[in-house]
Curated annotation (Swiss-Prot):
It comes from the Bacteria. Signal peptide: none annotated. Pfam families: TAL_FSA (PF00923). Keywords: Cytoplasm, Pentose shunt, Schiff base, Transferase. It is found in: Cytoplasm. This is Probable transaldolase. InterPro entries: Aldolase_TIM (IPR013785), TAL/FSA (IPR001585), Transaldolase_3B (IPR022999), Transaldolase_3B/F6P_aldolase (IPR004731), Transaldolase_AS (IPR018225), TSA/FSA_arc/bac (IPR033919). SUPFAM superfamilies: Aldolase. One of its GO terms (molecular function) is transaldolase activity. CDD domains: Transaldolase_FSA. Its EC number is 2.2.1.2.
Length: 223
């Protein structure tokens, strides 16, 4: 499973990339607003750090405008994937952009039927939001299971399942066990994956024991 980082914070992206686990990046208007930077300058800098798919989101609502915006975003860098909101207009735009060879990531997917439409339209990625479904007492991971089952039934579907709205390491583990193609993770979840209380306790004990190990005497200084 590939890991993308869900962030527009360049320093977070640098730190996660240094861990060797980041295969791509997803951004959205909310993340850009959080860092207070413009879309194009941020995407260009991210592309200079991570050599992988970088999702940049359209904010138009009509198909014609989404297509125009998508073309503009795709020109920023070869690694840009155009993020399209789910819906009738989004499907029209996805089909058109795909026909032009522009990669797409359909976002805000909350049902298997929506994911089926994304595959039919030729989307590169579909982004089901598991955390937001959990928030309303639905099972986000059950949706991932259903989408994967449907996609595996049809060999001609090439759309990758990009698990989004990931809240914790359990979501990551569940996505990996189900065989999702990608999970996009906030920086704090990436760091949580590396931690375990028994690891911390073991390191603490090893360091304490090391202090008890006799050390070789330093050779006398040359005169």
């Amino acid at each position: 499973m590939k890991f993308f980082i869900d962030s527009a914070d360049v320093e977070e992206i640098r730190k996660a990339h240094a861990m060797g686990c980041v295969d791509g990046v997803t951004t959205n208007p909310s993340l850009l607003a959080k860092v207070g930077r413009g879309l194009e300058e941020t995407i260009r800098e991210i592309c200079s750090i991570v050599d992988g798919p970088i999702s940049a989101e359209c904010v138009s609502m009509e198909a014609d405008e989404l297509i125009k915006e998508g073309r503009s975003l795709a020109k920023i860098h070869d690694n840009v994937v155009v993020k399209i909101p789910m819906g009738v207009e989004g499907m029209k735009a996805t089909k058109a952009l795909t026909a032009e060879g522009i990669r797409t990531n359909v976002t805000l997917c909350f049902s298997a039927n929506q994911a089926l439409l994304c595959a039919k339209a030729g989307a590169t990625y579909v982004s089901p939001f598991v955390g937001r479904l959990d928030d309303i007492s639905q099972d986000g991971m059950e949706l991932i299971s259903h989408i994967l089952e449907i996609y595996r039934n049809y060999e001609h579907f090439n759309t990758q399942v990009l698990v989004a709205s990931v809240r914790n390491p359990v979501h990551v583990l569940q996505a990996a066990r189900l065989g999702a193609d990608v999970a996009t993770l906030p920086y704090n979840v990436i760091t949580q994956l590396a931690n375990h209380p028994l690891t911390d306790a073991g390191i603490k004990k090893f360091l304490a024991d090391w202090e008890k190990v006799p050390k070789a005497a330093k050779p006398p200084a040359a005169k």
